[in-house]
């Protein structure tokens, strides 16, 4: 099956938006600060007139992927769906901010393969101890009690990215400091380049 051709090209959309489309994956342990940083980046870019959208892993899990669990196959399918949605949005000139654990290198590679040169990977690096201390949803505590099987960081692995485009120390740096570094870096790597 072939996708229909668009009557308005990506280049036309990007000219109208004043910037190119791109996808930025914020990956890290649960409670590493991905969603907080994604929302801060979204607000900053929106305030500057950029067309942005946040795809948060938790939101996708209660909507688009509500039929999926946490088996290896379900995690793979969740990432596939998110990468396809991100690709559609990027093609329409959006800057897509993905806040997802994406715990394994092979899962992050799905994004890299699907999104190609439009993809940037940012590791929100925070120690397991810091993430467990934060535990805003009580998931770490539940996982430690054996109530959550396959919870990343406790009973399922998180593979730190070896090829992340940017590493942010979200465990010790403030949200503001991480946001400032992220915005500066996005400018340096031409994601925030006016067309």
Where are these regions (language model features)?
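ATP-dependent NMP and nucleoside kinases share a basic, alpha-helical "lid"
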Residues: 63-70, 74, 86-144, 150
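Conserved lysine of the Walker
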Residues: 34
């Amino acid at each position: 099956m072939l996708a229909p051709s668009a009557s308005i090209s990506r280049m036309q959309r990007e000219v109208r938006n004043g910037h190119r489309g791109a996808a930025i994956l914020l990956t890290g342990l649960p409670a590493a600060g991905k969603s907080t940083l994604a929302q801060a980046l979204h607000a900053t870019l929106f305030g500057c007139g950029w067309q942005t959208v946040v795809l948060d892993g938790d939101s996708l899990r209660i909507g688009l992927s509500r039929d999926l669990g946490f088996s290896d196959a379900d995690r793979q399918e969740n990432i596939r769906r998110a990468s396809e949605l991100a690709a559609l949005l990027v093609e329409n000139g959006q800057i897509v901010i993905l806040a997802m654990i994406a715990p394994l290198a092979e899962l992050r590679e799905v994004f890299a393969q699907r999104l190609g040169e439009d993809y940037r990977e940012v590791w929100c690096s925070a120690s397991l101890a810091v993430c467990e201390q934060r535990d805003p949803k009580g998931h770490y505590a539940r996982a430690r009690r054996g109530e959550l099987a396959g919870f990343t960081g406790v009973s399922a692995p998180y593979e730190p990215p070896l090829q992340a485009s940017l590493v942010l120390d979200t465990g010790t740096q403030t949200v503001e400091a991480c946001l400032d570094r992220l915005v500066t870096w996005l400018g340096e790597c031409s994601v925030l380049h006016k067309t």
